[in-house]
C-alpha cells in the first residue's frame, strides 16, 4: 500500500540502477533490527555485506540469521537465496563500497545517526539510496551533516523485519523525491508492504498508534486499574484478532452496521469526550468527520459491509486456528 506524494522537496541524483536490478545490499548496524534486515535480504536472494562495530557482531549476526531461517523457509525463499551470500566486513567502508542499496540500523541516538549517515554518504557510491531504520527521528533532523542529503530516506521496519511486512518510507526536507520513490519501489520489489508517507512526523504512523496504546496501558497499571496480563489478554483475545485482518478504522466502520463509519460517528462520536482515555480527544468537526468516512469508504474498495464482515470473520478464524486458540468441536472435545 502506498500513499503519495512524499514529503521530500528538493531534487537530487537518481539511483545508479533500477530497483528491480539491485543485487548487492549493505546492512550497517546488525543488532535485532539490522540483523533482521540482513536475514530478509538474504532470503530474497540478495548478496548482503554487513558491518557493526561490536567485536562479536559477526557471531551474533550469523546466529540471528540461522535462527530466523526456518521461518523464512516457511515463508518461501527466493531463487538463489542462501545464508552463504552474507559477507561481514571489518570496516564500514568495505561494507558499502559497491552497495546498490544501504540500510542503516544503528542505535536510536540522534548524534550517532547524524555522524553515521554522513560517513555512509561519504563512503557509498554516488547516487545509491541510503535508508535509515530509525523508529522515530525525522530524516530532516538526521541528514544535517551529509554532503548529499538528497539520497537519504527513512525506511522504518517493524520487528522482526524478516517476518513483518510493513516498512514506512519518508524523506526529509532535503531528500530528493526521486530517492523516496526509488526506495519505496525497491522495498516493494524486496517483498515488503510499503507506506510512503506524505509528510514527516516523529514516530511515523504505526509507532504513534502503538505509543498511544502503550501510554494508556502504563496509566492503567500505575493506577492499579488493570494488570499486565489483563491488558495483554484484552488485546490478544479482543481487538487484536480483528486488527490482524483489518485495521482499527475499518473495524470501527463495521461497528456502524450498514450505515458504516457515518453511523458510527453519529452515534458514538460524542463518547470521544468521555473519560475512556487520558489522551486528549480531537474535536470531531465536519472536516474530520468527512475525512474519516471517506477514508473508510476508500479502504472498503467497493466491498459491502456484508463482504467485509465475512472477510473479517474468515480472517479471525484463520488467526485463531494459527495460534491454536480455535475452540474444538464437540466431537473433538469428547475424545
Curated annotation (Swiss-Prot):
Location of the protein in the cell: Cytoplasm
GO cellular component terms listed in the entry, alphabetical order: cytoplasm
UniProt GO BP: carnitine metabolic process; catabolic process; fatty acid metabolic process
Residues the entry annotates as binding NAD(+): 29-34
EC code: 1.1.1.108
Pfam annotation, one family: 3HCDH_N
Entry keyword set: Cytoplasm, NAD, Oxidoreductase
Top-level taxon of the source organism: Bacteria
Pathway: Amine and polyamine metabolism; carnitine metabolism
Catalyzed chemical reaction(s): carnitine + NAD(+) = 3-dehydrocarnitine + NADH + H(+)
Molecular function, one GO term: NAD+ binding
Its job: Catalyzes the NAD(+)-dependent oxidation of L-carnitine to 3-dehydrocarnitine.
HAMAP family: L_carnitine_dehydrog
Oligomeric and partner information: Homodimer.
Family: Belongs to the 3-hydroxyacyl-CoA dehydrogenase family. L-carnitine dehydrogenase subfamily.
Protein name: L-carnitine dehydrogenase
Species for this entry: Streptomyces griseus subsp. griseus (strain JCM 4626 / CBS 651.72 / NBRC 13350 / KCC S-0626 / ISP 5235)
Source lineage: Bacteria, Bacillati, Actinomycetota, Actinomycetes, Kitasatosporales
Amino acid at each position: 500500500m502506498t500513499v503519495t506524494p512524499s514529503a521530500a522537496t528538493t531534487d537530487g541524483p537518481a539511483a545508479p540502477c533500477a530497483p528491480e536490478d539491485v543485487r548487492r545490499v549493505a546492512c550497517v548496524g546488525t543488532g535485532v533490527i539490522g540483523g533482521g534486515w540482513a536475514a530478509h535480504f538474504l532470503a530474497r536472494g540478495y548478496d548482503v555485506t554487513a558491518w557493526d562495530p561490536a567485536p562479536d557482531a559477526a557471531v551474533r549476526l550469523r546466529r540471528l540469521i540461522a535462527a530466523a531461517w526456518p521461518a523464512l523457509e516457511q515463508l518461501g525463499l527466493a531463487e538463489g537465496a542462501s545464508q552463504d551470500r552474507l559477507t561481514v566486513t571489518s570496516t564500514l567502508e568495505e561494507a558499502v563500497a559497491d552497495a546498490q542499496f544501504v540500510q542503516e540500523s544503528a542505535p536510536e541516538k540522534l548524534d550517532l545517526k547524524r555522524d553515521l549517515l554522513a560517513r555512509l554518504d561519504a563512503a557509498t557510491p554516488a547516487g545509491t539510496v541510503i535508508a535509515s531504520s530509525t523508529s522515530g527521528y525525522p530524516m530532516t533532523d538526521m541528514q544535517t551533516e551529509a554532503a548529499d542529503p538528497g539520497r537519504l530516506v527513512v525506511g522504518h521496519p517493524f520487528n522482526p523485519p524478516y517476518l513483518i511486512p510493513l516498512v514506512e518510507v519518508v524523506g526529509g526536507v532535503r531528500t530528493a523525491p526521486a530517492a523516496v520513490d526509488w526506495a519505496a519501489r525497491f522495498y516493494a520489489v524486496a517483498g515488503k508492504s510499503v507506506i510512503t508517507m506524505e509528510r514527516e512526523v516523529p514516530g511515523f504512523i504505526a509507532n504513534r498508534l502503538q505509543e498511544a496504546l502503550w501510554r494508556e496501558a502504563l496509566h492503567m497499571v500505575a493506577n492499579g486499574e488493570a494488570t499486565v496480563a489483563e491488558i495483554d489478554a484484552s488485546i490478544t483475545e479482543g481487538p487484536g484478532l480483528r486488527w490482524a485482518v483489518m485495521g482499527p478504522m475499518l473495524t470501527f466502520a463495521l461497528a456502524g452496521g450498514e450505515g458504516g463509519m457515518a453511523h458510527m460517528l453519529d452515534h458514538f462520536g460524542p463518547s470521544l469526550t468521555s473519560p475512556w482515555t487520558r489522551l486528549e480527544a480531537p474535536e470531531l468537526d465536519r472536516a474530520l468527520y468527512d475525512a474519516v468516512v471517506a477514508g473508510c469508504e476508500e479502504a472498503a474498495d467497493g466491498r459491502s459491509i456484508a463482504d467485509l464482515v465475512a472477510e473479517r470473520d474468515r480472517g479471525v478464524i484463520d488467526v485463531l486456528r494459527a495460534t491454536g486458540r480455535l475452540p474444538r468441536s464437540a466431537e473433538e472435545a469428547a475424545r
